[in-house]
């Protein structure tokens, strides 16, 4: 069947909009063969209070997804990762409130083993855990899928990993993090 221009216009209004307005970052550290993934817990009186999650956040107007990832990691954890990867598959979910399919670019970020975590007021605890423990703690299936992708695409060491390292792209685009959220001193935070 051959499509005519007016046929396409008749179909398009029925298509559910797709948008990328959020990012997800799986921050990890390694020492030798030991590897730990950072999870942060949503603070009380916040939406999803008590839920363990990777770093997540919104993409601001005019901001790229990777720049949003850098900014959110800095704002929510105080960390400045040394290496970054864009995972092959974004997370995706349907938002019934807005009748949109949301696409969430997923990144992996490596930090130094000794880097201190300073949480924003959005979270009340953090924990560095094994990949298996992280998969048990997170709420969403898409986050468990991303943990498997992190293992297979970034950490396996195989040259055929589908994740693309984007560390050099950050320097080229000057995706410099800026801190805008107030922080409480790290001494008040408890590790889980």
State where each predicted segment sits:
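Conserved Nudix-box catalytic region and its N-terminal flanking loop in Nudix hydrolases
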Residues: 34-75
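Charged phosphate-binding loop/patch that engages nucleotide di/tri-phosphates or the phosphate backbone
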Residues: 139-192
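Active-site segment of metal-dependent pyrophosphate-handling enzymes
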Residues: 74, 78-114
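Short, charged/polar surface micro-motifs in flexible loops or helix N-caps
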Residues: 31-34, 45-47, 60, 100, ...
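Short aromatic/basic micro-patch
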Residues: 53, 101, 128
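NUDIX/MutT-family hydrolases
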Residues: 106-108, 116-150
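Conserved N-terminal beta-strand and adjoining loop/helix that marks the start
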Residues: 2, 8-38
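Short, well-ordered beta-strand micro-motif
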Residues: 27-29, 41, 106-110, 128
């Amino acid at each position: 069947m051959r499509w005519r221009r007016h046929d396409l216009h008749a179909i398009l209004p029925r298509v559910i909009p797709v948008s990328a307005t959020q990012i997800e970052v799986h921050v990890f550290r390694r020492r030798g063969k030991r590897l730990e993934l950072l999870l942060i817990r949503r603070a009380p009186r916040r939406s999803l209070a008590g839920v363990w999650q990777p770093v997540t956040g919104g993409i601001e107007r005019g901001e790229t997804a990777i720049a949003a990832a850098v900014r959110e990691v800095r704002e929510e954890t105080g960390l400045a990762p040394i290496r970054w990867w864009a995972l092959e598959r974004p997370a995706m979910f349907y938002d019934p409130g807005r009748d949109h399919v949301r696409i969430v670019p997923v990144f992996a970020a490596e930090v130094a083993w000794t880097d201190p975590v300073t949480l924003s007021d959005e979270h009340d605890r953090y924990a560095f855990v094994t990949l298996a423990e992280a998969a048990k703690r997170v709420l969403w299936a898409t986050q468990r899928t991303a943990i498997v992708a992190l293992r297979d695409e970034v950490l396996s060491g195989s040259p055929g990993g589908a994740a693309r390292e984007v560390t050099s792209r950050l320097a080229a685009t000057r995706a410099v993090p800026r801190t805008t959220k107030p922080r409480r001193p790290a001494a008040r935070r408890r590790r889980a």
